[in-house]
């Protein structure tokens, strides 16, 4: 008997020592819910002496912002009841019969409930359900219950308060909030992908997941707003300047040029392509600028159903295919004229037909299937699908670059052979401008080609930064949070290469002797009104060194006759491929 008694005492002592009780805060109390957050109102909230509902809501709203960007399956009554009960726990009251004092105790959320919600909402990396309370070092989320010792208050030694497990409910509860810079947009979700009732992707809304209510802003937070404005403004400015320059050159070589040769036609058709590319770049002015064209709403990118977007995309694709084809034709013709000096090609009608057919074939189908859309992280309306980009642009561009590279190399080789054998340095100077034009355009096309492959090869790295972006927006105000993307300088260079062609051409041809000759002999400066103004200007002038105004007029007329008579015609200017 003595041995059994000793064993009983040992067991009792061990059990009572091992039993751990949650502490009771004598100043803790039950309060009515103040209702400042976006949760279902509660009748009674437990508040300890070291906290209040307002401070608890700061933490609560942090997780609401996190859940706002989560899937719809996470946004249900079960999830929100669990989250609310974690920071604003339900209050349980025990009355001390000897003093009639109310003892408040929190009803903690069950561990399995916490684990289920954090796993379903994919926030296990942000919230630890196994954490301990700071003072008692007991689980914040008990497995079954919280045990209290209420003997001091006239109660039981092992007062058991079951943990809280809200009723299971799959009813969706949309909180209408997303962490900045994400933008909330309500929608009815039936399933995934094409099962969504509003088919939002076709309207330009991009959600962070298939069943989320948070949309990515437009433009995407790859750069700061100031940097995006700079990109858009740069694109607008260069496009406008390029448009004016190319229109001037087209008028010069195609409209007022009285003696057009086939090289003038080649150059004019290339310039016409640049005009169309520039129009595509300036079409945003019709809707308030490039930003408004690409992003009609703060969370919507422009798509093919927007008339201005569809027009800009089609014109750009048609024009840039035209441009690279005429570039290839020019390089071939330049090589052929140098290689076979006395032989002439008369293929201009064939060239025009071939360029039109190819350009239409590579642009119209894309418009029919709605591929011309604005990108969230781009400054141009273009082909959206990488597959169609490769088929309808990068593939043809690769072929053209190969052809262009071959003929440019052959041109340089032929010039080298001629200069080396004949010592005609003036021949090299003669071909310098067309060669420079080919090289500049070639280099910009090469950059576009290489940049595309850089972007595609870096996509995994860009997408891999989404976790860092998510951590940033839930822990800060989101203003400085960025999704990793291409360097800012590379985007500016891409803008430059796409929009600069008109400036290239006018720098090489806009003020050449041939251009000046075309304008001086054109109807613009040779009509009755212009002649009267010239006569008036000359007759009103004073002479220097005894020369009369009549002498000046006669000298001018003689020079004019020499330019239009037996001298070289405007078609024999140094811009042509002619041996001297």
Curated annotation (Swiss-Prot):
Induction: Down-regulated by phagocytic stimuli. The chain crosses the membrane at residues 237-257, 265-285, 309-329, 350-370, 392-412, 435-455, 491-511. Residues 542-580 are annotated as: Disordered. It is a multi-pass membrane protein. Keywords: Glycoprotein, Membrane, Receptor, Signal, Transmembrane, Transmembrane helix. Residues 551-563 have a biased composition (Polar residues). InterPro entries: GPCR_Fz/Smo-like. It is found in: Membrane. Belongs to the G-protein coupled receptor Fz/Smo family. PANTHER family: FRIZZLED AND SMOOTHENED-LIKE PROTEIN K, G-PROTEIN-COUPLED RECEPTOR GPCR FAMILY PROTEIN. Lys-Thr-X-X-X-Trp motif interacts with the PDZ domain of Dvl (Disheveled) family members and is involved in the activation of the Wnt/beta-catenin signaling pathway. This is Frizzled and smoothened-like protein K.
């Amino acid at each position: 008997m003595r041995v059994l008694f000793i064993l009983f005492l040992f067991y009792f002592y061990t059990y009572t020592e091992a039993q751990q009780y949650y502490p009771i805060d004598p100043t803790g109390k039950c309060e009515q819910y103040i209702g400042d957050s976006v949760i279902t109102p509660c009748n009674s909230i437990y508040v300890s002496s070291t906290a209040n509902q307002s401070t608890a809501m700061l933490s609560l709203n942090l997780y609401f912002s996190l859940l706002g960007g989560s899937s719809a399956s996470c946004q249900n009554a079960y999830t929100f009841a669990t989250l609310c009960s974690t920071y604003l726990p339900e209050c349980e009251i025990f009355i001390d019969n000897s003093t009639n004092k109310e003892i408040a105790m929190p009803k903690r959320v069950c561990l399995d409930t916490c684990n289920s919600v954090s796993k379903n909402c994919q926030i296990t990396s942000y919230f630890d359900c196994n954490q301990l309370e700071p003072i008692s070092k007991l689980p914040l989320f008990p497995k079954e219950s919280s045990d209290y010792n209420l003997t001091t208050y006239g109660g039981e030694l092992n007062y058991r308060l079951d943990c809280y497990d809200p009723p299971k409910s799959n009813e969706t509860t949309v909180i209408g909030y997303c962490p900045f810079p994400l933008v909330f947009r309500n929608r009815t979700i039936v399933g995934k992908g094409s099962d969504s009732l509003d088919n939002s992707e076709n309207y330009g809304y991009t959600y962070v997941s298939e069943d989320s209510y948070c949309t990515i802003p437009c433009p995407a937070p790859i750069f700061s707003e100031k940097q995006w404005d700079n990109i858009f403004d740069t694109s607008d400015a260069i496009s406008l300047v390029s448009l004016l320059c190319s229109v001037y050159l087209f008028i010069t070589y195609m409209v007022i040029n009285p003696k057009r040769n086939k090289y003038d036609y080649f150059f004019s058709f290339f310039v016409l392509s640049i005009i169309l590319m520039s129009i595509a770049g300036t079409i945003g002015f019709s809707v308030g600028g490039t930003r408004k064209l690409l992003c009609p709403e703060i969370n919507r990118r422009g798509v093919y159903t927007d008339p201005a977007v569809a027009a800009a995309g089609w014109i750009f694709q048609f024009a840039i295919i035209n441009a690279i084809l005429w570039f290839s034709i020019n390089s071939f013709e330049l090589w052929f004229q140098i290689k076979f000096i006395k032989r002439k090609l008369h293929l201009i009608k064939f060239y025009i037909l071939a360029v039109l057919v190819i350009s239409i074939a590579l642009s119209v189908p894309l418009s029919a299937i709605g591929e011309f859309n604005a990108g969230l992280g781009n400054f141009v309306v273009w082909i959206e699908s990488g597959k169609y980009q490769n088929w309808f642009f990068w593939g043809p561009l690769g072929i053209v670059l190969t052809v262009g590279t071959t003929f440019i190399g052959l041109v340089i080789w032929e010039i080298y052979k001629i200069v080396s054998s004949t010592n005609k340095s003036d021949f090299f100077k003669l071909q310098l401008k067309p060669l420079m034009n080919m090289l500049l355009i070639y280099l910009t096309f090469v950059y576009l080609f290489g940049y595309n492959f850089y972007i595609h090869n870096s996509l995994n790295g860009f997408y891999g930064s989404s976790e860092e972006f998510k951590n940033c927006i839930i822990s800060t105000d989101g203003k400085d949070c960025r999704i990793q993307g291409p360097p800012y300088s590379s985007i500016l260079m891409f803008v430059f290469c796409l929009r600069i062609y008109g400036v290239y051409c006018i720098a090489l041809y806009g003020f050449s002797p041939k251009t000046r000759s075309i304008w001086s002999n054109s109807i613009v400066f040779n009509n009755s009104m212009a002649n009267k103004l010239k006569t008036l200007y000359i007759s009103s002038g004073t002479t220097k060194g005894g020369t009369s105004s009549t002498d000046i007029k006669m000298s001018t007329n003689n020079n004019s006759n020499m330019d239009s008579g037996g001298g070289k015609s405007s078609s024999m200017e140094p811009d042509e491929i002619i041996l001297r």
